Every structure is written in structure tokens, then in C-alpha cells.
């Protein structure tokens, strides 16, 4: 999860988030190189007296500044398209969880189980225990098995919401009348926090998401106790 004065991204917990972090670094390096080149050219223009005010055209320069931006765009587009494909591809999920957004809470349904569903509300500040996180704790966590592909079906009962867990690289809009899907795969156990990321009304900031990733055996015991 995020911590005060954090400058970088949250620690990656899923393969998708690892790819997104690498792509961020890749793109940032390209932006840094372009910015350095532009600043260098500007500094030369300001400090040198060797200018060509009478030059009408320069085929070599025009060729370079046409081909170079195109090549840079390709270097950005190819890994981006690859990650977009990975985010949309779901291969043999072991579990499907349906998530519905409401004003202002989330409800979850494990479609592979009978009668395994619950609502998840934020715990008010005056009911928090020592060590709990303000505006992030919920009364019912979403318990999922780690290291396995899980399909999340996401929609809304009323207005636009967005189901987002940054450390897993997840952000999927919850749209009334439409069913969107996302893949969840965690590399390690733990608690992972998110929030509604679409302005949805007065209590928009009071819709936290808590995923509890556990080993498969623990998940089976939990699901058996809930059914």
C-alpha cells in the first residue's frame, strides 16, 4: 500500500503491475532523453552566433525529424499494446467473482459457490482498532487464493464507479447495465487496498476495497465456513 511522502509506484504484487512498472520506467527514460536533447539544442541556440537565417530548406534535417519521432512512437506503442493484450486476456480462471458498485459500498458474489455473497462497507473512524487504516478498512474483506488467475466481473447498480487496486495494476470501470472484466493474480499473500476511482457522489471517498490474498488451502477453509 502507499505510505506518506511516497514518490514512486506501489510495490508490484501481480505480473501485470510488474509489466506496467517496467513500461513506466521505459517511457520515462524516453521522455528524459527527449527533454535533454531539446534543452541541449535550446542552449546551443542561445549561446552560439553560428545561425543560418538564410537557409530555406534542409532535406537531411527534415528527414531526421520525421523518422526519429516515428521510431520513438513505435518504441512506446509496441510494449503498450502488448500490456493491453495481457490485461484483456483471461486464460482458464479458477474462480470468478462478481463485483457490484453501490452508493456507497461494494457487494461481492462468488459465482462458483452457492450463496457465497456479501456487502463490504467501510469501517467508520470511531470503530477502528489500533493499527487499522483510516478510510481503508472494511467489515468484509474479499478473500482470494494467491498465485492463481481469478476473473473479476465488475458492474454497478446505480451510477458510475471504478474498482481499483493499484498494487495489482487494476482499475476497471463499474458501469450500470454493462459487465466489465479484469484478471487478478497475486504473487504473494497479504492485504491489498484500493478505493473507488470514479467520482460517484457525496461519499465517493468512503468506498474502500480490501483484498486478502491467502494460500489455496486457507481459501478453501474460508469458503467452506462462509457457505
Curated annotation (Swiss-Prot):
Topology, Mitochondrial intermembrane side: 1-14, 88-227
Keywords annotated in UniProt: Copper, Electron transport, Magnesium, Membrane, Metal-binding, Mitochondrion, Mitochondrion inner membrane, Respiratory chain, Translocase, Transmembrane, Transmembrane helix, Transport
Recorded GO MF terms: copper ion binding; cytochrome-c oxidase activity
GO cellular component term of the entry, any: respiratory chain complex IV
Listed cofactors: Cu cation
Protein name: Cytochrome c oxidase subunit 2
Ranges per topology, Mitochondrial matrix: 46-59
Organism: Uromys caudimaculatus
Cofactor binding description: Binds a dinuclear copper A center per subunit.
Regions that span the bilayer: 15-45, 60-87
Record has DNA-binding as a keyword: no
Function: Component of the cytochrome c oxidase, the last enzyme in the mitochondrial electron transport chain which drives oxidative phosphorylation. The respiratory chain contains 3 multisubunit complexes succinate dehydrogenase (complex II, CII), ubiquinol-cytochrome c oxidoreductase (cytochrome b-c1 complex, complex III, CIII) and cytochrome c oxidase (complex IV, CIV), that cooperate to transfer electrons derived from NADH and succinate to molecular oxygen, creating an electrochemical gradient over the inner membrane that drives transmembrane transport and the ATP synthase.
The protein's assembly and partners: Component of the cytochrome c oxidase (complex IV, CIV), a multisubunit enzyme composed of 14 subunits. The complex is composed of a catalytic core of 3 subunits MT-CO1, MT-CO2 and MT-CO3, encoded in the mitochondrial DNA, and 11 supernumerary subunits COX4I, COX5A, COX5B, COX6A, COX6B, COX6C, COX7A, COX7B, COX7C, COX8 and NDUFA4, which are encoded in the nuclear genome.
Record Pfam families: COX2 (PF00116), COX2_TM (PF02790)
Subcellular location: Mitochondrion inner membrane
Binding of Mg(2+), residues: 198
Family, per entry: Belongs to the cytochrome c oxidase subunit 2 family.
Amino acid at each position: 500500500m502507499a505510505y506518506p511522502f511516497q514518490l514512486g509506484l506501489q510495490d508490484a504484487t501481480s505480473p501485470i503491475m510488474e509489466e506496467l512498472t517496467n513500461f513506466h520506467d521505459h517511457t520515462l527514460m524516453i521522455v528524459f532523453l527527449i527533454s535533454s536533447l531539446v534543452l541541449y539544442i535550446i542552449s546551443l541556440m542561445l549561446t552560439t552566433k553560428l545561425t543560418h537565417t538564410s537557409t530555406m530548406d534542409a532535406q537531411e534535417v527534415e528527414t531526421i525529424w520525421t523518422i526519429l519521432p516515428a521510431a520513438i512512437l513505435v518504441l512506446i506503442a509496441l510494449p503498450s499494446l502488448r500490456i493491453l493484450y495481457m490485461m484483456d486476456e483471461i486464460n482458464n480462471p479458477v474462480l470468478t467473482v462478481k463485483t457490484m458498485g453501490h452508493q456507497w459500498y461494494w457487494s461481492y458474489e462468488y459465482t462458483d459457490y452457492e450463496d457465497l455473497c456479501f456487502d463490504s462497507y467501510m469501517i467508520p473512524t470511531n470503530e477502528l482498532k489500533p493499527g487499522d487504516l483510516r478510510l481503508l478498512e472494511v467489515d468484509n474483506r474479499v478473500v482470494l487464493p494467491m498465485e492463481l488467475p481469478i476473473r473479476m466481473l465488475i458492474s454497478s447498480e446505480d451510477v458510475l464507479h471504478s474498482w481499483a487496486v493499484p498494487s495489482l495494476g487494476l482499475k476497471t470501470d463499474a458501469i450500470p447495465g454493462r459487465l466489465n472484466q479484469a484478471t487478478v493474480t497475486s504473487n504473494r499473500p497479504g492485504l491489498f487496498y484500493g478505493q473507488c476511482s470514479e467520482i460517484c457522489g457525496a461519499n465517493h471517498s468512503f468506498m474502500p476495497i480490501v483484498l486478502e490474498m491467502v494460500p489455496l488451502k486457507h481459501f478453501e477453509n474460508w469458503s467452506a465456513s462462509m457457505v
